[in-house]
A protein has these predicted regions:
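C-terminal lobe/tail of nucleotide-utilizing enzymes
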Residues: 3, 26, 45, 58-62, ...
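Walker A/P-loop phosphate-binding motif and the immediately C-terminal alpha-helix
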Residues: 103-142, 275
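Conserved Switch II/interswitch segment of TRAFAC-class P-loop GTPases
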Residues: 213-220, 238-259
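Phosphate-binding loop that captures ATP/GTP phosphates
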Residues: 127-194, 200, 207
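Extreme N-terminal, non-catalytic leader segments
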Residues: 25-28, 33-37, 45-108
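N-proximal, solvent-exposed amphipathic alpha-helical segments enriched in charged/polar residues
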Residues: 1-30
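Residue-level signature of catalytic and energy-coupling elements of molecular machines
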Residues: 10, 29, 101, 112, ...
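Phosphate-binding/switch loop-helix module in NTP-utilizing enzymes
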Residues: 183-233, 253
Length: 353
């Protein structure tokens, strides 16, 4: 629990008379003191009376109790002082920590449930096995799964810096990859109930306030879908381009078009390095020579041709991949055929950027 955590929690409190602006954006957080398992926050109110003062104090206390570890003492004080000048964008970010990153690649999907995070994790491990320096930012703020898939749940994230203005997250290193997830920061199993502006701020912190160091690839596991969070992320992070993950199923393929259009939007204009078809066929462990096309056949390849984007490959639906994700041991670590599929995918991506 640190100052950055508390600032994030206080972003959950909006001033009803100030639209969607929260306490942090309004410059109302005057001081934060953390000592001996207790939190004391001081809010600054203007000289003119604010009829919502008691409400905001109570809402701030509730946000702190809701998010802080059990048993934490919480106190919210107030002072009469004109709040600091509000920032139009809330917490300010810069690109300094990305200066030594060669390629930033967003891993996207038009819808959830297509295995985007599984592909991200195994693609990262495969790139590392090919000798590249790799990092992964899990920006899926609503369902971060990378801590589970990498066996890094419960890891304590270290911080660099003397105060909240220059604190940096230190990513977890495992399997030759640097990992940082919203799930690492928020804690295992903690519900993330954030509105759009708060979600955008959280994922930007994960990407822009992390000491990544020199990297050949930084993969960003983006939230599924296409919306304001995605546009905000793409606008603020200098992505080299994107990879879109789908299944051969018609329902998933219909969402690929929306994802492609998002990156091709005139306000975005990011290259699409290719499309990955996940769950292309099912092969029973006892019958490795058999293929069952449960979701249709070659739909991803056809969609890639229709959109005139590279087709990076097909990943089967097999027990080893699922078990590796559940156990935190990515299948790309192995030289079996399914692991080899991710190595081939990594080689094609490296050639495409």
């Amino acid at each position: 629990m640190n100052t950055q955590d508390i600032l994030q929690w206080l972003q959950q409190v909006q001033h009803p008379a100030q639209g969607d602006k929260n306490l942090v954006e309004l410059g109302m957080v005057h001081d934060i003191d953390i000592k001996d398992g207790a939190i004391c926050v001081t809010l600054a109110f203007p000289k003119r009376p604010d009829p919502l003062k008691n409400y905001l104090v109570g809402a701030a206390q509730a946000a702190l109790y809701r998010n802080a570890p059990g048993g934490t003492e919480v106190e919210v004080k107030t002072i009469v002082k004109d709040p600091a000048k509000p920032s139009p964008k809330g917490i300010q970010f810069n690109l300094e920590q990305l200066r030594e990153v060669s390629h930033i690649v967003g891993i996207a999907s038009g819808k959830g449930g297509v295995g985007k995070s599984t592909v991200t994790v195994n693609l990262a491990v495969a790139l590392a096995r090919l000798g590249y320096r790799v990092g992964v930012a899990d920006a899926d703020v609503y369902g971060p799964s990378i801590p589970t898939m990498t066996g890094t749940e419960g890891v304590t994230i270290e911080m660099l810096g003397e105060d909240e203005n220059d604190n940096l997250f230190v990513p977890v290193e495992k399997y030759g990859v640097k990992w940082l997830s919203v799930g690492h920061v928020s804690g295992a199993g903690q519900a993330l109930i954030w509105r759009g502006p708060m979600a955008s701020t959280a994922l930007k912190q994960i990407i822009l306030q992390t000491a990544w160091g020199p990297l050949d690839f930084l993969l960003i596991d983006m939230p599924p879908g296409t919306g304001d969070i995605h546009i905000s992320l793409i606008g603020d992070v200098p992505m080299s381009g994107a990879v879109i993950v789908t299944t051969p199923q018609a329902v998933a393929l219909s969402d690929v078009l929306r994802g492609a259009n998002m990156f091709r939007n005139p306000q975005v204009q990011k290259p699409i390095f290719g499309l990955v078809e996940n769950m292309s066929w099912f092969t029973p462990a006892a019958h490795p020579e058999e293929k069952y096309y449960l979701f249709g056949k070659d739909g991803g390849a056809q969609m890639a041709r229709n959109l005139d984007i590279p087709f990076l490959g097909q990943i089967p639906l097999v027990q080893d991949i699922r078990e590796g994700a559940d156990e935190g041991t990515p299948v790309a670590l192995q030289d079996r055929p399914d692991g080899q599929a991710f190595l081939e995918l990594a080689s094609k991506l490296a050639a495409a950027v």
